[in-house]
């Protein structure tokens, strides 16, 4: 199927198309920028923004030159903002190779308040930077500049030698040089004396805690909360959440302003408003600040001998371009602070230890934009806190996007049901004439079916002439395609697109046959866009030449007025599914029978393969649990212990035979009862808790010992129908570790003897001081990671020791890095962490999974001097048990997926059977043939009911709604017996119908398909239990009981007698028991008995000499003549 625009799927081809669009958009950005530079005051923004349709051809060479010049200017501009100064250094000699023109005045001017002796340094090309600052400042700067990940140490606090003024030195490395921004420390600030990560976090701690506490499931709530927190944190006049759409245009999705400011919520902007080059810079430099758009820029003087132009991409001081400054001033924004929101681009994580393979592809999802109506400066600690907050926000956005994808996957299952429902009724006209119809399939403004040269319409549609014109165009220009999807018929080249107007801009069309088509239509995008700000006042008119929000919004509407909202991938999947089903809807009965046989074969194969695989996994699971060296125990739904392995018996002193049958809450310490009770309740509801700590009592000789401390994972035990039948606990004994930790925290003197003790009970421990430098690394950590103490000491714990790039212990991705930072910073501020899952790659590539516990380290006065981090590792046996558990879950999931697939696939041949039956009904048939067709219809209705039974619990627990249908008992009985005739003939069993004629002709009210299902199930079990050559009979009696004047109850009793030894006791106990351990046949009997109970009836089974009888009683209503 062809498409006029590139899709946004995660495949390589779509990425190449996406890259091509970015390149094309960059050329458009460059052209717009060149027009602005050349036109000066005569620049017309509204007309220039519509450059998307400029032909390439002969203008391409010029366009390439314009683009190259534009990118050079964006990345290698030679001006900075005046709120600070800049130096560029040679990385080897630390001598100045470039400086801003205001640097000599800011850094070397003599202050009369600071006495000085000797010559004053003069700032210029070639000067050693260490001569400009005090001795300690020069040493701190030299240490930082020699650091691998230099940005981790930002900011470095330095003092000028001449004036004594404090500055934050913010360093970043570019090719061939070091760039340093110097920002004055304001008099009201408390100077930050060390690396900023742990210090800056305190500013954003409240906001991060609030974001992380939000319930998932609402992107709008998440964005609104983020905007609110940034508004309170920064104090700017306006804060907006800005999202990029698939076609790169932007939308304000959340906003908060101070009173009196015009809102921009809901405004859409063309992609050119934030150029691709600027977006690239946001990916590199996550926070961007403009202090005063009216301030005069300062030139950067560069050593003329340098063989390259300096790039200022990573500098906060980098001056914005004049077109952006005009845009800001026109929207009454003098200062801005912008944070990038960078999320995963949909790739799966690699499992390789190679960092390039294990990182996800990133994309710029949007921006958090702060504006101020007056000049405003945000100091570096606040900007760093904002960057950290934006990283946490990006992780949460990513999770919301994953939830949305899961929701879409669930919609696929719903769609399959919807499609089948459509085709079960009068295909194909039922998909437009009944409800639900094809407009319910996807979001659209109109749809049409062209079938046998007749048009069937829904919603907005072209005229007959226009639609036939579209079909002719498709047949001529898209001959080899099965259809077309486009968000702009005009851009796709349809000659009559403009005549269709705004009502039909986008179209998805699929070919069903040579002459039959399906169409969906969408109106132009502007119809979906809502202006969220104040309306124009009477007589007020925008200046379309200027760059500001109203002109951008107008420009956006101009660009999209012939375009609709794009068709999403999942929408096209639905369309393709309907197309394929319609194509196959009219296959002959032979094809239907072939499909049915194929499905039965798959079911049988699945049963055999699945049971063998499940038995093998179960046997291995039991062996591992019994022999595991970790405590494993289990309870049933009532909390009674039904599993207690050797290890937990050894730890507690309670033998297996004594533990079985006891309630779990009687075995745990009183202080842990509430914790365990909560775990049980959540697990039985399907919510499995992990890494929960509780204590369990000791018994026998160990009764007087301390209780056993466990870290426990709870998982729900489920049967083959995915019903929860108990809870399994996989634990880790931490009694020894806890005693060590308790002793450790009480130590006031020299703790090093404990930390560095190589005793196996000492867990892996590492630590950091209050500034983020690694200060502890015990021998257990060396054994675990492969890195010696000397390799990591005095390195930044966040970034150098644990990080995502060149760190000693590489974390899996950026999300893990940010979460680790949050854990450490929470602990510094007093929020000590529970056992948290943690993972990293050790020195030689092995991935280590463990639990992390972080505690703050205090001095004698109680002040925080750093952190201690303890790692807890799972034993080999526990890891193997968890691996087998995952295999078991994967096997169950595989079975469920295959069963769900087969259940859906049954619908298609079933619709073919129905169609064939309806065709036969229209022919001349004899009375006997009509009766056979009627029996077939009865069986089909029963099958429909069973396929709709997705929730067995509702039947078993008695919540199913029964239908009230009028039926003759004769019809139900014939359909039920027909379902066992093949089996009985194979065993040469004679079935006799001993019902009296009057009873068979009785007309009743009730759920006839369910009654038919019940009788067929009991007949089948009876046939299975009857020996070959035996006999089976069915008889019944009816008792009427009048209630009132018009209603009569029918108390109906069926007796199914069969010869032989009878139904096995085990099967009968399953019928009268629960579904927990029932076999497939037992489940069938149990469901049948529950259905009988829903009909106010009961089932009995009598054994006699040489024969047995099922007695089934139900309560129905008699259909009176007056009714």
UniProtKB/Swiss-Prot annotation:
Occurrences of domain GAF (ranges): 218-401
Pfam name, any one: HATPase_c
Gene3D superfamilies for the chain: 1.10.287.130, 3.30.450.270, 3.30.450.40, Histidine kinase-like ATPase, C-terminal domain (3.30.565.10), PAS domain (3.30.450.20)
GO biological process: detection of visible light; red, far-red light phototransduction; regulation of DNA-templated transcription
Cited SMART domains: GAF, HATPase_c, HisKA, PAS
Molecular-function GO terms, alphabetical: phosphorelay sensor kinase activity; photoreceptor activity; protein homodimerization activity
InterPro entries, alphabetized: GAF, GAF-like_dom_sf, HATPase_C_sf, His_kinase_dom, HisK_dim/P_dom, PAS, PAS-assoc_C, PAS-like_dom_sf
Binding site for phytochromobilin: 323
Record-annotated PAC domain positions: 690-746
Post-translational modification: Contains one covalently linked phytochromobilin chromophore.
Keywords: Chromophore, Photoreceptor protein, Receptor, Repeat, Sensory transduction, Transcription, Transcription regulation
Region of interest (Disordered), ranges: 1-20
A single GO cellular-component term on record: nucleus
Record domain PAS: where: 617-687, 747-821
Biased amino acid composition, Low complexity: 1-14
Record-annotated Histidine kinase domain positions: 901-1118
Recorded family membership: Belongs to the phytochrome family.
Subunit structure: Homodimer.
Function: Regulatory photoreceptor which exists in two forms that are reversibly interconvertible by light: the Pr form that absorbs maximally in the red region of the spectrum and the Pfr form that absorbs maximally in the far-red region. Photoconversion of Pr to Pfr induces an array of morphogenic responses, whereas reconversion of Pfr to Pr cancels the induction of those responses. Pfr controls the expression of a number of nuclear genes including those encoding the small subunit of ribulose-bisphosphate carboxylase, chlorophyll A/B binding protein, protochlorophyllide reductase, rRNA, etc.
Name used for this protein in its record: Phytochrome A
Organism this protein belongs to: Solanum tuberosum
Gene: PHYA
């Amino acid at each position: 199927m062809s498409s006029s625009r590139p899709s946004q799927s995660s495949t390589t081809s779509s990425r190449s198309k996406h890259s091509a669009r970015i390149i094309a958009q960059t050329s458009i950005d460059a052209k717009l920028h060149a027009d602005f530079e050349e036109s000066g005051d005569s620049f017309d923004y509204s007309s220039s923004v519509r450059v998307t349709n400029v032909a390439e051809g002969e203008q391409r060479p010029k366009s390439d030159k314009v683009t190259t010049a534009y990118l050079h200017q964006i990345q290698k501009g030679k001006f900075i903002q005046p709120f600070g100064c800049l130096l560029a250094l040679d990385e080897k000699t630390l001598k100045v190779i470039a400086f801003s023109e205001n640097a000599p005045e800011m850094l070397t001017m003599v202050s009369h308040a600071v006495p000085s002796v000797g010559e004053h340094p003069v700032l210029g090309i070639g000067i050693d930077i260490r001569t400009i600052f005090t001795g300690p400042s020069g040493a701190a700067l030299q240490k930082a500049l020699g650091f691998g990940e230099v940005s981790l140490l930002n900011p470095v606090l330095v003092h000028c030698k001449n004036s004594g003024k404090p500055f934050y030195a913010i360093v970043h490395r570019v090719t061939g040089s070091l760039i340093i921004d110097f920002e004055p420390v304001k008099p009201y600030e408390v100077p930050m004396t060390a690396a900023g990560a742990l210090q800056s976090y305190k500013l954003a701690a409240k906001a991060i805690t609030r974001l992380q506490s939000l319930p998932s499931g609402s992107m709008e709530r998440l964005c609104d909360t983020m905007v609110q927190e940034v508004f309170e944190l920064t104090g700017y006049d306006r804060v907006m959440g800005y999202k990029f759409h698939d076609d790169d245009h932007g939308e304000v999705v959340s906003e908060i302003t101070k009173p009196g400011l015009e809102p921009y919520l809901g405004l859409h902007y063309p992609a050119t408003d934030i150029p691709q080059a600027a977006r690239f810079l946001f990916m590199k430099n996550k926070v961007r600040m403009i202090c005063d758009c009216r301030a005069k820029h300062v030139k950067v003087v560069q050593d003329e001998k340098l063989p390259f132009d300096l790039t200022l991409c990573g500098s906060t001081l980098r001056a914005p371009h004049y077109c952006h400054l005009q845009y800001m001033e026109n929207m009454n924004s003098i200062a801005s602070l912008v944070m990038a929101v960078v999320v995963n681009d949909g790739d799966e994580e690699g499992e390789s230890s190679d960092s390039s393979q294990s990182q996800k592809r990133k994309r710029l999802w949007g921006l958090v934009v702060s504006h101020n109506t007056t000049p405003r400066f945000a100091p570096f600690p606040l900007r760093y806190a904002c960057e950290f907050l934006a990283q946490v926000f990006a992780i949460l956005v990513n999770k919301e996007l994953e939830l949305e994808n899961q929701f879409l996957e669930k919609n696929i299952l719903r769609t399959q049901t919807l499609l089948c429902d459509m085709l079960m009724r009068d295909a194909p006209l039922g998909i437009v004439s009944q409800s639900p119809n094809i407009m319910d399939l996807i979001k659209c403004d109109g749809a049409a079916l062209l079938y046998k040269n007749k048009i069937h319409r829904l919603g907005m549609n072209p005229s007959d002439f226009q639609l036939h014109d579209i079909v002719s165009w498709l047949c001529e220009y898209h001959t080899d395609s099965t259809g077309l999807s486009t968000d702009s018929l005009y851009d796709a080249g349809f000659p009559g697109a403009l005549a269709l107007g705004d009502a039909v801009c986008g179209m998805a069309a699929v070919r069903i046959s040579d002459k039959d088509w399906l169409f969906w239509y969408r109106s132009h995008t502007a119809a979906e866009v809502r202006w969220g700000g104040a309306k124009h006042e009477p007589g007020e008119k925008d200046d379309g030449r200027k760059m500001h929000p109203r002109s951008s919004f107008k420009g956006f509407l101009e660009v999209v007025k012939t375009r609709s909202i794009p068709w999403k991938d999942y929408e096209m999947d639905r369309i393709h599914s309907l197309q394929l089903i319609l194509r196959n809807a009219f296959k002959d009965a032979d094809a239907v029978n072939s499909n049915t046989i194929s499905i039965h074969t798959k079911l049988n194969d699945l049963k055999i393969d699945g049971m063998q695989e499940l038995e093998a996994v179960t046997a291995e699971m039991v062996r591992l649990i019994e022999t595991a060296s970790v405590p494993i125990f289990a309870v049933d739904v009532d909390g009674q212990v039904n599993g207690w392995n050797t290890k937990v018996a050894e730890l507690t002193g309670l033998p297996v035979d004594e533990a079985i049958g006891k309630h779990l809450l009687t075995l745990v310490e009183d202080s842990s009862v509430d914790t365990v009770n909560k775990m049980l309740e959540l697990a039985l509801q399907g919510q499995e808790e992990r890494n929960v700590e509780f204590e369990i009592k000791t018994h026998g000789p160990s009764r007087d010992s301390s209780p056993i401390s466990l870290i426990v994972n709870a998982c729900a035990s489920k049967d083959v129908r995915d019903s929860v039948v108990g809870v399994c606990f996989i634990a880790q004994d931490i009694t020894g570790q806890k005693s060590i930790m308790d002793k450790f925290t009480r130590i006031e003197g020299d703790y090093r003897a404990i930390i560095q003790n190589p005793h196996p009970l000492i867990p892996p421990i590492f630590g950091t001081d209050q500034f983020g430098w690694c200060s502890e690394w015990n021998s257990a950590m060396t054994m675990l990671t492969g890195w010696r103490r000397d390799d990591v000491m005095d390195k930044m714990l966040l970034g150098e020791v644990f990080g995502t790039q060149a760190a000693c212990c590489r974390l899996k991705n950026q999300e893990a890095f940010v979460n680790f930072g949050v854990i450490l910073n929470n602990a510094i501020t007093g929020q000590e962490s529970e056992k948290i899952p943690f993972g990293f790659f050790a020195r030689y590539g092995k991935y280590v999974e463990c639990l992390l516990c972080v505690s703050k380290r205090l001095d004698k006065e109680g002040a925080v001097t750093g952190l201690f981090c303890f790692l807890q590792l799972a034993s080999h046996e526990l890891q193997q048990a968890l691996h087998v558990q995952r295999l078991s879950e994967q096997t169950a999931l595989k079975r469920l997926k295959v069963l769900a697939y087969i259940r859906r696939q049954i619908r298609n041949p079933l619709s073919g059977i129905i169609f064939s039956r309806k065709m036969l009904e229209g022919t001349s048939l004899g009375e006997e043939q009509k009766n056979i067709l009627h029996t077939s219809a009865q069986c089909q209705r029963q099958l429909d009911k069973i396929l709709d039974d997705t929730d067995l619990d509702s039947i078993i627990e008695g919540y199913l709604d029964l239908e009230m249908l009028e039926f003759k008992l004769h019809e139900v009985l014939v359909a039920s017996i027909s379902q066992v005739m093949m089996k009985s003939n194979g065993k040469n069993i004679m079935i006799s119908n001993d019902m009296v004629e009057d009873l068979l002709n009785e007309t009743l009210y009730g759920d006839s398909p369910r009654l038919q299902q019940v009788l067929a199930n009991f007949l089948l079990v009876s046939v299975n239990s009857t020996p070959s050559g035996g006999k089976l009979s069915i008889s019944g009696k009816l008792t009427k009981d009048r209630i009132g004047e018009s209603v009569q109850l029918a108390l109906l009793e069926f007796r199914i007698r069969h010869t032989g030894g009878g139904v096995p006791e085990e099967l009968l106990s399953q019928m009268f028991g629960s579904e927990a351990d029932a076999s497939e046949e037992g489940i069938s009997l149990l469901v049948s008995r529950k259905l009988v109970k829903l009909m106010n009836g009961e089932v009995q089974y009598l054994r006699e000499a040489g024969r047995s009888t099922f007695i089934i009683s139900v309560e129905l209503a008699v259909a009176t003549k007056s009714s």
